[in-house]
Amino acid sequence: MQLDPTILVIAAAAAILLLKLLLSRRAPAALVAEKIKAGATVVDVRSEGEFRGGAYRGAINVPLQVLSSKLDRIPKGRPVVVYCASGSRSAMAVRLLKKAGYQDVCNAGGLHQLP
């Protein structure tokens, strides 16, 4: 039995889209705005180059690839809002921060989705 290569490509693309959706789990915009207004630490997990190219006002840059070794830059006693370019890296960062003991962390998605 042979499978049509087109069907395999479509199935792979659908799996990738589903994975991205499951990984991103972006917080509602109203919740993100509320947390920022209440004084949340806003963390940009994009690369330093991306950050220099434009960032959310007041955000700190802790690239995802060094986040686990730079946790001391993010206070634990305040809410944390994390963003990246699309929401995928920030979703990974949220999981990492929660495993590290951060309680109030949310994924804002991409930079252009912030209030």
Locate the predicted segments by residue.
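Short acidic-hydrophobic, aromatic-tinged amphipathic segments that line or gate anion-handling sites
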Residues: 62-63
